[in-house]
Amino acid sequence: MSEIKIFHNPRCSKSRAAVSLLEERGIAAEAVKYLDTPPDLSELKDIFNKLGLESARGMMRVKDDLYKELGLDNPDLDNDALLRAIADHPALLERPIVLGKR
């Protein structure tokens, strides 16, 4: 298993560019197609903590129609509620997310 993990959507140009950049630099990475194998709530919490974000919105597609349809723009929602929404609707996960040793 690689020390680098990238949460990847092959249909996303930015995600494809990130994978290409890693390959060009000879960096082996485990590509997780998160729409096919979505992270569960526990893994999302781990990702959130590793990213060091103040708000889970930093790892969400906040401009996506689904985000607004689900009322996730409500400022009263806490990080747990937002992470549960990503677990239930993995398309809300902003990509790419690259995790590994610094």
UniProtKB/Swiss-Prot annotation:
The record marks H8, R61, R95 as: Important for activity. Its EC number is 1.20.4.1. Pfam families: ArsC. InterPro entries: Arsenate_reductase, Arsenate_reductase-like, Thioredoxin-like_sf. One of its GO terms (molecular function) is arsenate reductase (glutaredoxin) activity. The active site is at C12 (nucleophile). The keyword Oxidoreductase applies. Gene3D superfamilies: Glutaredoxin. It catalyses: [glutaredoxin]-dithiol + arsenate + glutathione + H(+) = glutathionyl-S-S-[glutaredoxin] + arsenite + H2O. Keywords: Arsenical resistance, Oxidoreductase. It is an enzyme of class 1 (oxidoreductase). GO terms for biological process: response to arsenic-containing substance. Belongs to the ArsC family. Involved in resistance to arsenate. Catalyzes the reduction of arsenate [As(V)] to arsenite [As(III)]. This is Putative arsenate reductase. The gene is arsC.
